[in-house]
């Protein structure tokens, strides 16, 4: 029989019920945080980690997660995922799990950046175009202007940030004249900040290798009157 004044999480006994009520041990704290987004992210990655490395279909429980010695590291990464809002989250999770990089080092900008650059090169042109247009529309709604004027009117610091975040794909940026015209307005520093994300030499070869996709971008831009 469990004593009524014993913490069900850590087993500690208290002489007064009120003391038990305000008591917060690490196991209880983890239980109370269960519905926090960053904890849910960490739990999801924890489950996927064991699916990949143990080749099992048996899903890890939240109780197993709270008792794991790696709980804090997974939660830290879950918080980092909230911060960066990664492109294709499930692919990103698999990328870091299979990267052979230590768990404690997963929440690193350079690791995500490498993933993002690879993903921008590999994703279908339709997905890249859809995301870029959605980004332009968000900007247009904020500014109360036409989204097709993005490349002409957006302030360059914002454009730099959205290129670095992968929100504006090289498919669109380098695939239409308006995007290239905006790049010509960048300072040397801004060009340097975006260089590794857009890699003009790579994308020039990409357009030659996939002429139908390049034409699709150009025709979409023309139809939308992106200028």
Give short role names for the model-derived ranges.
Residues 147-227:
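Charge-dense, extended regions
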Residues 1-43:
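C-terminal recognition-helix end and immediately following basic linker
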């Amino acid at each position: 029989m469990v004593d009524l004044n014993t913490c069900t999480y850590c087993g500690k006994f208290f002489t007064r019920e009120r003391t038990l009520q305000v008591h917060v041990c690490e196991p209880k704290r983890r239980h109370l945080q269960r519905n926090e987004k960053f904890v849910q992210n960490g739990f999801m990655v924890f489950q996927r980690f064991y699916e990949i490395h143990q080749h099992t279909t048996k899903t890890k429980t939240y109780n197993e997660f709270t008792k794991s010695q790696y709980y804090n590291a997974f939660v830290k990464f879950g918080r980092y995922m909230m911060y960066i809002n990664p492109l294709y989250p499930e692919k990103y999770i698999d990328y870091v799990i299979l990267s052979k990089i230590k768990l404690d080092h997963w929440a690193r900008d350079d690791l995500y950046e490498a993933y993002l650059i690879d993903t921008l090169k590999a994703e279908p042109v339709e997905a890249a175009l859809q995301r870029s247009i959605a980004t332009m529309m968000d900007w247009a709604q904020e500014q109360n202007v036409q989204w097709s004027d993005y490349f002409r009117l957006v302030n360059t610091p914002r454009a730099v940030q959205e290129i670095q975040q992968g929100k504006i794909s090289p498919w669109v940026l380098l695939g239409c004249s308006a995007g290239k015209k905006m790049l010509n307005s960048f300072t040397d520093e801004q060009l340097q900040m975006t260089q590794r994300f857009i890699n003009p030499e790579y994308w020039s070869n990409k357009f030659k290798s996939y002429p139908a996709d390049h034409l699709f971008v150009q025709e979409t831009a023309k139809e939308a009157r992106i200028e």
